[in-house]
Amino acid sequence: MGFFKSRQEKEGPELQEEPHYHHPLLEIVRIVSSNNPEILDSARKCMKNTEKYYQYHLEDYEARGMSLKDSPASLQWIGCIDLLIHHQFACECDWCEELSGFLLAVSDLKNVKRHSLDIEESWFQPRESIPQWCEILDKKWEKAGYVMAAFDIDSDSYVMFLCQKNFLKKLTALAESLGFRIDLAMNM
């Protein structure tokens, strides 16, 4: 009987941590950040003590017009998205961003660089919009299996990230389970 008791005591702390690894928002962060341990650790902190995380990142939240009156789920959603932006796994462009700014933001994404995806200015028309430019990238990167996806943050900006096409359905479902939205950037 002593064997089982000591084994249970050893497994106790691991079992307590397990739900944090299976939370839909952490799974989203894991996929988008390519399993980056530093980002996952920060995302866990955001979710474990949202109010403390909010206070530490007060300037970022206030820039988005958010306060502690917003729901914890919304604060966690935005906190994790800002974390991905800060670490260049996502980028944010205003709805009226010029082509040069869009191209710079997308080409600076870590996963675009990691996968050596080409971006040529000649593919785009400057008078078009971000959803149209993202549709062009989706077509150009189709053979490589990547698309431009986006987080809906209920604003007039686009928060985009490179997504393996085969992960998009899972990310969409995970976001929906939290009451939020991820979709192809061209659909935003």
Residue positions per predicted region:
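Contiguous interface-forming segments/domains that mediate binding rather than catalysis
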Residues: 1-188
